[in-house]
Amino acid sequence: MPHPLLPDLETLASATATGKGYKLCCVQVFTHLIPMTIQVQIRRKDGSDVSLDDCAHFSASMDEALEASQLFTEAYVLEISSPGIGDQLHSDQDFLTFRGFPVEISFRDDDSDLHQAGLLHKRSDEHVHINIKGRIQRIPRKAVTCVRLTNPTG
């Protein structure tokens, strides 16, 4: 059962995040912990990575907003974090950040589903380029259904 103050907390966190150049991803309240823990996850509005400094900066602002709102009368721990990146790459920033990382590309070719594994080289307007044993293979972007990070095998 969600905490009864969760909607108010989400509204407060969203307004605080927006005012500081962030986007709210998730708010959770863990009442089974002593003291209670409030976890807020944020992303940068411009899509760039959230740093520890960003978390510290937002933590101070969120703490002030919580204290001013007087939503909680009991002690709590405030945790600010970023959800990080999932396995799948979507944005241009993802492809820049993970250049050289091992990936698996799923794509369609002549009505069959294919998979190709290699090191991410780049993504252009027309193709996704991967390095397979030192050779660059280009896969048309419109055929690509998924690009996901994998663990290197050794």
Curated annotation (Swiss-Prot):
Keywords: Cytoplasm, Ribosome biogenesis. InterPro entries: Ribosome_maturation_RimP (IPR003728), RimP_N (IPR028989), RimP_N_sf (IPR035956). It is found in: Cytoplasm. GO terms for cellular component: cytosol. Pfam families: RimP_N. GO terms for biological process: ribosomal small subunit assembly; translation. Belongs to the RimP family. NCBIfam families: PRK14634.1. Required for maturation of 30S ribosomal subunits. This is Ribosome maturation factor RimP.
